[in-house]
């Protein structure tokens, strides 16, 4: 299965989740657009060294919204020309949030909507995150994009999780930020396996 990893915002933990997912389920990894360094692929290589990592779809030197980096660096690319690697089990990490621009005409959610694959939405706990989560879920539902689960990064907030589950009727998976010694997480692995019916290696 090919799966998109989308976020409610930038810096919510998409790459942390991607590293844990790839390490626990032997998935390959592809970053759709990389803006700036150090790269997310380098993070994956550090925490999940056995993961096959494909070259980024687009690489930008500028650590900014891709459409701005494209202009600043005078690059010529079209978002919809990015070709996804031919891999049976592939995690495709998007950049920023669902409505982060890819170029002058398209956002991340446009790409997901056109090149349909199921999606995992990643969020973390902060003031205002419930609003961002529900808006993101609604945007995916309106486009009939298959949302597999919501992953909440960081120390678990039971009250927030309960509200989101009751309101949005979506399964929630919890994953704390980790280091090299805790990336192989039994609870995370079992939660993912139960929801997605993934084969545990």
From Swiss-Prot:
Mg(2+) binds at residues 15, 40, 93. It comes from the Bacteria. Belongs to the dethiobiotin synthetase family. Pfam families: AAA_26. Homodimer. ATP binds at residues 11-16, 40, 93-96. The keyword Phosphoprotein does not apply. The lineage of its organism: Bacteria, Pseudomonadati, Campylobacterota, Epsilonproteobacteria, Campylobacterales. The gene is bioD. Its cofactor is Mg(2+). InterPro entries: DTB_synth_BioD (IPR004472), P-loop_NTPase (IPR027417). Pathway: Cofactor biosynthesis; biotin biosynthesis; biotin from 7,8-diaminononanoate: step 1/2. Its EC number is 6.3.3.3. The active site is at residue 31. This is ATP-dependent dethiobiotin synthetase BioD.
